[in-house]
Amino acid sequence: MRSSSTSATAVHSILAEHLIPVPEPLVVALRPRGEAGGEAPARAVASRAARALLDGPALEAAGPEAWPPWLAPHQIPAAERLSAILARHGGALLADAVGLGKSYVALAVALAHDEPFCLVVPAVLVPQWRGLLARFDVDAPITTHESLSATPCRPLPPVAARCRLFVIDEAHRFRNPDTNRHRALARLVIGARVLLVTATPVHNRLADLLHLFRLFLRDHALAALGVPSLRRATLGEVDASSIAPAAARLVVARSRGRVQSGYAGGPIALSFPRRSDAEPVRAGSAPDSVVEALVTGVGRLTAGGTAAPLLRLMLLRRLASSLPAFRASLARHEAYLDLVERAAADGRRLSPREFQRCFPRAETLDVQLVLFPVLLEQAGAAPVTGDRRELARLRALASDTRDLKADALERLLDAVPGKTIVFTDARATARYLLQRLRTRRAAAVFGAGGRFAAGEATRHEVLRAFAPAAQGASPPPPALETDLLIATDLLSEGLNLQDAERVVHYDVPWSPARLAQRVGRIDRLGSLHEGIATVTFLPPEPLAAALALEERLAAKIRAQVAAGSAQIETARGALGESPALDWCDRLSELARRAGDAAPIGAWAVVRGDRDAAVLIIRLGGLVDAIVVEGGIARADPVAATRLLAHAFTAEPAAHTAPTLGRAVEVAASLVRQRLAAVQDARWRATDRDRFARRLIPWVLSAGRRAARRGDAPQLATLDALVSRLASGMTAGEELLLEDVLSRREPLTVRDLAAWHERLPPLGSDDVGFDVELIAALVIQPAT
């Protein structure tokens, strides 16, 4: 349905579409149409199919001269595809593997749009981005993630607020919709284009990726591709196997292998260091008997109600890090008990400020998002006195003893000298290791600050001393030369520290994405070293079992594989490359190979090793590839891409009339299911919690009343509202609607109309339930 109507019969536009049955017969709609179709050369058909399946503006090879001269050859295809995705969908995600130069690609894409743009980056990366802008004489406002996290959100400078393109660096930080920063960004980018940049979009689950898409996509935008609702998909209510093929339309996520394999010009020589991943070191911060006793004692703590398991998990994490970190967490836990008792005596719950005093955000970011709402909901009952006694016993057990884990680290540093970064989860551990290793030319960074063994320093000073080449600095004076850098994960994002040749995961993080970010500081294009190494420390068995850390990592790795992450790290090193999203990149190459593409509806028959057909079909406004093989039809753009590539070199075959017809008949059932899914997403879904599902009947009822009055202007307004609600909403549009519905005053049509007018136009892509065969390729085995 179109976004508005001004005729006196506008009410029919409102009431009709949700009553329209799925078109029949589909076989007729899917057959080549008259002069537009017909047999054509296989290369031309494959080119037409590839261009259509990319589902964006015409993607012609513009050549290097169309892009800034500082863009490397392997970065140009990424920039071209991102520009096309932005033009088609209003947003895109750049998730190339670490070290391929995503910042340069993002800047080139922003400049190509020839409109003011704003950078949204972590505060620690502002100097790096300012340097990049200055290097290429580019002026752009920068706002920080931290400013969006503030309560209330700090207003943007006027020059930034006027921007219609936002480049979000380290975009994975916006994966959680329950955070202030996600809500602030969602509102900020309404009606603007959004370029998300991160090598690790999936940290914990596939929903991370979908929440990023919701910043610029409406909820039903991918229904024709098998994802009827992005919001329902985040809840696990959509088949995960359909998400990656749909997501590929929005993502450039190239593995290093894909980039090195080259494009039309042949392989590209990229100089990455050779990886050497040592066997994990299993060691505890105390003898096994002490660790086992501490694990048992932590298991006896019961304060926190339903949050007690999470509180115990935090203590166990710190025990896995170091005894100093564990003792600091015991002190925080006891402070939490004090506050809970005080709040209970006052008949109230903990305040957010009190919670943050007990659990500093920088120390427990990954857990705090879960703990915060759960703990604040506790009724305030005083903890059992047994917890006090158990904490005292744990403090006594955690007194200074031999640190087997730190001993193992020292042996490692002695055995293989070289610049090394040691990553830890806990600031207390970083301080402890710096003190213990102070004679090894060590320094540390935590948060915005840093420290040499001799005293305090700025973060910038420490990084320049440790990695002068990567930071573009002169060699430090001998007194500040640094071979060992101890850091928390705040250092793991965005920075180039490739003077170093080894990363030590002293603590295993919550997410494999953190492992990739850490290694990415040194595993970069143009490294100074032929080879680099990683070493992971794992907790001893009793503690490992209590943490179930490796099982958690395995589950998150499975989510990364499902999402097609370009780089996946495990505790034992790189898992290998996941090329699940590379097929769109290969399509771009196919689209440029041939000269003129075949007309819409054309088909070709070629020889191959199987009996199969590829049907490129536009339905519900989007394009998908259906592969028919063995009498079964499946939506499979990955397999379709391989078959289209085969068509460029395959021998033509004689066409037998029934072959294409049979494929169309088999595919019709799947197409019918997809069309029904689009229709259900708009009108018949049973998701009763959605605003749209409650409001559409209300607006339709108002439309009937307006029709009886003959109020054409009111009907036009209601028509536009139904179109808006039926199309689903972005996360920001939904937040604005929530503001309207949360007012105390009764809801009126005028309120909804005002909300609708604040939003960008729906556009002309809403083509309802039309079906069109774009191209068909039949593969016949040699007889």
Spans of features found by a protein language model:
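Charged, low-complexity
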Residues: R2-G91, R164
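SF2 helicase/translocase NTPase motor core
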Residues: S47-P73, E80, G90, K102-L107, ...
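A short beta-strand element within the Helicase C-terminal
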Residues: H211, N496-D507, A533-T536
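Conserved SF2 helicase motif VI
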Residues: P512-H529
